[in-house]
């Protein structure tokens, strides 16, 4: 019997070995084996990562080295921008492809591939479009000091200037401010049409944002980037927010994924419905495609396999989303892969797709 193909998951099994995301990853590979797309066994090697912002950069790089030492020929993980920026040079040095969900444009190199759980520039453009479409032309911005926050705000200022959106007030905060309500109160005093949050998302995911808004009694129209998809930490924490999302009920692959998952495991995917299970499934499917297309089962071979993918159907994003890659073009989502969601009464709602605009 041939030796199994080893794939590494660096912090990517979000709820641990045997959890829902591990099941999703295995479902894509099991389907490939059952259909004959993969003609040899596979083995997953999981590492918890424990990287930034709560852990350390060294934990992330040590985790990547561990997976390579275990014989993995590709690694999915380093999903936050902090860790992607940290691990990217190592992936390039060791010639083992890294597939990350990071939104940063600083994930760069021959062996760095991005199935973005957002895009710092794209998020900003869509946020500004939503503001413009809804008549919010004078806004307040909560800008966070973090790799994502800095990048988001740089793009946001550019897009706001382009579309004629005025930034009435800015408050700059860390990822753990001493009193968030004080900063939000300062923004409220500017009497903006809407509130914009530009940051990684832990302020919302930990419930600090909702607590602070409730404390000062402020309920403005509000929007954030793909920090919104930290709703997997609890929809109640994101009540009333619009955000950049990747879950589109009209995508025909969404009900097919749900049907297959239920048939295989007898339960719903984690916190269904939301985008993260779909993104996990597509990540695993992309790895399968890369293995199938690889001229040799090695790091460079998987890289070549990834770079040959074109018009691969995607369950993530809108109905026209597809996945593609080529040499030196490693951002893999194409089409309407970013869209709008809203949390109302503790549930995720579809808020709409990108719409063309005229000068």
Positions of predicted regions on the chain:
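Extracytosolic ligand-binding ectodomains
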Residues: 1-359
């Amino acid at each position: 019997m041939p030796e199994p193909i080893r794939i590494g998951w660096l912090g990517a099994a979000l709820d641990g070995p045997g959890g829902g995301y591990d099941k999703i990853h295995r479902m894509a590979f099991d389907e490939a084996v059952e259909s004959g797309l993969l003609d040899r066994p596979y083995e997953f090697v999981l590492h918890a990562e424990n990287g930034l912002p709560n852990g350390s950069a060294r934990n992330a790089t040590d985790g990547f080295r561990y997976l390579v030492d275990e014989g993995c020929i590709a690694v999915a993980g380093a999903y936050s921008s902090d860790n992607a920026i940290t691990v990217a040079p190592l992936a390039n040095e060791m010639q083992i492809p890294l597939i990350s969900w990071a939104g940063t444009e600083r994930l760069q190199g021959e062996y760095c591939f991005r199935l973005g759980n957002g895009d710092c520039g794209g998020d900003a453009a869509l946020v500004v479009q939503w503001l413009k479409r809804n008549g919010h032309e004078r806004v307040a911005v909560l800008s966070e000091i973090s790799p994502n926050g800095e990048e988001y705000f740089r793009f946001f200022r550019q897009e706001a200037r382009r579309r004629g959106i005025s930034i009435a007030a800015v408050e700059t905060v860390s990822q753990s401010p001493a009193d968030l309500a004080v900063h939000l109160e300062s923004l409220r005093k500017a009497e903006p049409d809407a509130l914009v949050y530009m940051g990684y998302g832990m302020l919302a995911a930990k419930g600090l944002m909702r607590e602070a808004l409730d404390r000062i009694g402020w309920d403005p129209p509000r929007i954030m980037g793909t920090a919104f998809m930290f709703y997997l930490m609890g929809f109640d924490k994101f009540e009333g927010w619009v955000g950049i999302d990747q879950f589109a009920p009209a995508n025909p692959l969404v009900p097919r994924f749900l049907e297959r998952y239920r048939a295989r495991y007898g339960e719903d995917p984690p916190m269904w419905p939301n985008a993260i299970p779909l993104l996990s499934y597509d990540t695993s499917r992309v790895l399968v495609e890369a293995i199938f297309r690889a001229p040799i089962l090695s790091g460079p071979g998987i890289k070549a396999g990834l770079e040959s993918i074109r018009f691969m159907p995607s369950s993530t994003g809108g109905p026209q989303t597809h996945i593609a890659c080529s040499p030196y073009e490693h951002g893999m989502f194409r089409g309407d892969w970013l869209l709008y969601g809203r949390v109302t009464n503790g549930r995720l709602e579809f808020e709409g797709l990108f719409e063309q605009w005229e000068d």
